Swiss-Prot record:
GO terms for biological process: regulation of DNA-templated transcription. Residues 37-61, 89-112 bind DNA. Keywords: DNA-binding, Nucleus, Repeat, Repressor, Transcription, Transcription regulation. Transcription factor that negatively regulates genes involved in anthocyanin biosynthesis. SUPFAM superfamilies: Homeodomain-like. This is Myb-related protein Zm38. GO terms for cellular component: nucleus. Residues 9-61, 62-116 form the HTH myb-type domain. It is found in: Nucleus. One of its GO terms (molecular function) is cis-regulatory region sequence-specific DNA binding.
Length: 255
């Protein structure tokens, strides 16, 4: 539950205070004191809220209020207190007897602030504006000497390092490791082209000195060494153009 309002707004007056209301408020406070501001309006016969009565008394009707302009000493004191306390006007007013916080705030915004700006002083920091501008323009964005020295040392160390593989040529073609093994196996086995060539050459007539020509029966393997064979004098029998000794595996020993 929030705090209840100090008055019923439907039955209170608003706006400027009249002379009669000021006289009633002053007469009641002189007779009974300030007391409780919530119950004071009803006791004094005023159709005002307690907050309105309090502000009217403190800011306008107090007998110890100072009237007139601020003096030079008060101006200096306000500037010094503002540099220490900032915009805490109630604390500043407590050190200026007879002056209210609202009065001091209005005087600061209308007179003192402009006076400080005219003197070249920042009203927030209370420092010379020219000095602040110089400090801003002299900001250097160059790297610190330690950082520059570290970067130079790192560059020298990188340049001093020798390459690990100076003779490495990345353009070389790398053959698969099984190529050499395949070449060896091909050398051990007779080529199919060689066998085919042997067959073709065996059926041709080059004379008896080169193996001789085979007859039709020997070339088909039907007759071997028959009396009518004209190629019986050749070394070994031929079948399909191959000598018989080439296909004879009886002399080989089984491992």
């Amino acid at each position: 539950m929030g705090r209840s309002p100090c008055c019923e707004k439907a039955h209170t007056n608003r706006g400027a205070w009249t002379k009669e209301e000021d006289e009633r408020l002053v007469a009641y406070i002189r007779a009974h004191g300030e007391g409780c501001w919530r119950s004071l309006p009803k006791a004094a016969g005023l159709l005002r809220c307690g907050k309105s009565c309090r502000l009217r008394w403190i800011n306008y009707l107090r007998p110890d209020l100072k009237r007139g302009n601020f003096t030079a000493d008060e101006d200096d004191l306000i500037v010094k207190l503002h540099s220490l306390l900032g915009n805490k006007w109630s604390l500043i007013a407590a050190r200026l007897p007879g002056r209210t916080d609202n009065e001091i705030k209005n005087y600061w915004n209308t007179h003192v602030r402009r006076k400080l700006l005219g003197r070249g002083i920042d009203p927030v920091t209370h420092r010379p504006i020219a000095a602040d501008a110089v400090t801003v323009t002299t900001v250097s964005f160059q790297p610190s000497p330690s950082a520059a020295a570290a970067a130079a040392a790192e560059a020298e160390a990188t340049a001093a390092k020798a390459p690990r593989c100076p003779d490495l040529n990345l353009d070389l073609c790398i053959s698969p490791p099984c190529q050499q093994q395949e070449e060896e196996e091909v050398d051990l086995k007779p080529s199919a082209a060689v066998v085919k060539r042997e067959v073709l050459l065996g059926g041709r007539g080059h004379g008896h000195g080169h193996g001789g020509a085979l007859c039709f029966g020997c070339s088909l393997g039907v007759q071997k060494g028959a009396p009518g064979c004209s190629c019986s004098s050749s070394n070994g029998h031929r079948c399909l153009g191959l000598r018989g000794g080439m296909l004879d595996f009886r002399g080989l020993k089984m491992k």
